[in-house]
Each structure stands twice: as structure tokens, then as C-alpha cells.
Amino acid sequence: MKLNELSPADGSTKKRMRVGRGVGSGKGKTAGRGVKGQNARSGVAVNGFEGGQMPIYMRLPKRGFTSPGSKNMSWVNLGRIAKAIEAGTLDASNVTEESLVAAGVVRKARDGIRLLAKGDAPQKLTITVTGASKAAVEAVEKAGGSVTVTGAPKDAAEE
């Protein structure tokens, strides 16, 4: 059996009905749309219109807001950095946000890159990032490396 030999099971599909092609077809004249009214017209769909009933998007309350000071950070795990170093696309002695983007480890730096602890830390890794989790910093330092965090530290109130 090949992909080009596959076909639907017998009786599982119906032929498409061509409507509005004469009274004898059974779906002529009004073409299954009934008589007059908004639904009989072409271009009927008005997005969000529910026939005069208060639409769902107006019945429900507005919620939340977008914080003006929020940061949209990219993130990278230690395991992903270790793979890139093994593949030879990253130099473990000097890893920066620019080198992570250039090596394809992170697609975009956005408002900075945050280092997370999933995976094993490579030996003697020296990395400079905007943010890092406590577990990631501990893992890198335990493996004999160092982490430099350039971003502002979190406020005590935020933790």
C-alpha cells in the first residue's frame, strides 16, 4: 500500500450538491436558504452579530491589562547550551546573548535572554545574560563556571 493508493471507504463520502440549478434538482430556486430574510442574502455573516441579542463579547466583562513595564524575555536552558558547545557552534569560554543568537540557540533576544536550569551545565562555562534563575547560577558555578547577570535584580517585593 502506498500513499497515492489510499482512498476513502466506499459510502463514506457524499458528492457535493450544486444548489440553485433548477427546480428539478431538488435544491433549485432558493437553494436551501428559505425565503427572504438576512440569511437568504449573500454576504450574510456579520462578525460578532447575534441577531440583535447582546453579543457574547459585550456580555462578558473586560479583564486585566498589559503592564507597561513588562519585559518579554527569551529563555534558554543549560542543556541547550551544552548541546551547542558539543556541536562546536558556541565557545564555552565566552557566551554572550549575541553569540547565542548567532549560533541559533535562541531565535531572538527580545528584551534579553534568561538562563534556566534544565539539563546539565557544561564545564567551565562563562556566560553573560540579562537574567538567570538561582538554580541555573548554582549549577554553572558548581560545574566550575561563572554567570554574569546584566539585568536589574528583581525587587524583594516581587519575589
From Swiss-Prot:
Signal peptide: none annotated. SUPFAM superfamilies: Ribosomal proteins L15p and L18e. GO terms for biological process: translation. This is Large ribosomal subunit protein uL15. Part of the 50S ribosomal subunit. One of its GO terms (molecular function) is structural constituent of ribosome. The gene is rplO. It comes from Hyphomonas neptunium (strain ATCC 15444). Coiled coil: none annotated. Transmembrane segments: none annotated.
